[in-house]
Amino acid sequence: MTTALDQLKQYTTVVADTGDFQQLAQYKPQDATTNPSLILKAVQKDAYKPILEKTVRDHRNESTDFIIDRLLIAFGTEILKLIPGRVSTEVDARLSFDTQRSIEKGRELIKLYEAAGIGRERILIKLASTWEGIRAAEVLQKEGIKCNMTLLFSLVQAAACAEAGAQLISPFVGRIYDWYKKQAGAEWNEARDGGANDPGVQSVRRIYTYYKTFGYKTEVMGASFRTTSQITELAGCDLLTISPDLLQKLQESNETVARKLSPETLQDKPAERVAIDEASFRFQLNDEAMATEKLAEGIRVFAADAVKLEKLIDALR
């Protein structure tokens, strides 16, 4: 019997969302993604503490920022030994509103990978999908540095990323689901509001349809899943990045997975492109309470985890 994971791989590029790279081999993902929270989680495990300790030891007299960059590269390098494709490495969330420093950080990370013998074609630089982050991606893409736009919760963010020529976007599913479920409170009905009607699933479907309708080349990678149902409802999306626990559930399941998204079977096609000059971008994002709140919260959480990682490093000096 073919597993749900194997069926999914027929329609979609499967990506592992983890810093715990020892789990990668069993799921055979094409790519992998990391973020500050996942790296923080990994370095607190006994299996990965030696990577943190060695990185600090080798660069003890350098700045904490310098050490964090080397730590990210150390994890990315190990991950790339286990997958055939690309790894995503995230720019510090505290630079989310600073275009120039985001550009500089993206260039620095690519230089470090190249110094480690890894070509830029195997790296995606992750940036928050703020106006400033999108402008940074526009510059980096023109330099041959491919970008993965994260913390993406709305069509206007997706439209702006595509116009900027970003390589890939990561529209979040689970965090959108969380927001709407919390807003609904006791009125939420999983049978009615989940599955194909899940607001997070619908958001990715809308973005996928928009991109394919207007011929954008930017890849759509659904992210932030809470359940296997959210994943299988998006079978056919260009890529899906999935945590090890959900990869495990898909591997253990023999449920039939049917293709749900395809460029040939688009429904509810948009009539026109979204206006995305800076003023309209900011207004449309502000007008969508969920996207505004979740973007702000996501940046705060990633920034807080970056601070925790700095404290771990400083304690080892």
UniProtKB/Swiss-Prot annotation:
Keyword terms, alphabetized: Cytoplasm, Pentose shunt, Schiff base, Transferase
Gene Ontology CC terms: cytoplasm
Enzyme class: transferase
Reactions the enzyme catalyzes: D-sedoheptulose 7-phosphate + D-glyceraldehyde 3-phosphate = D-erythrose 4-phosphate + beta-D-fructose 6-phosphate
InterPro entries per the UniProt record, alphabetical: Aldolase_TIM, TAL/FSA, Transaldolase_1, Transaldolase_AS
A GO molecular-function descriptor: transaldolase activity
Pathway assignment: Carbohydrate degradation; pentose phosphate pathway; D-glyceraldehyde 3-phosphate and beta-D-fructose 6-phosphate from D-ribose 5-phosphate and D-xylulose 5-phosphate (non-oxidative stage): step 2/3
One GO-annotated biological process of the protein: pentose-phosphate shunt
Pfam families named among the record's database cross-references: TAL_FSA
Localisation per UniProt entry: Cytoplasm
Catalytic residues (UniProt): 126 (schiff-base intermediate with substrate)
The keyword Cytoplasm appears for this protein: yes
Major location (coarse): cytoplasm
Entry superkingdom: Bacteria
Similarity section: Belongs to the transaldolase family. Type 1 subfamily.
Oligomeric form and interacting partners: Homodimer.
Known function: Transaldolase is important for the balance of metabolites in the pentose-phosphate pathway.
Stated name of the protein: Transaldolase
Protein source organism: Burkholderia cenocepacia (strain HI2424)
Upper lineage: Bacteria, Pseudomonadati, Pseudomonadota, Betaproteobacteria, Burkholderiales
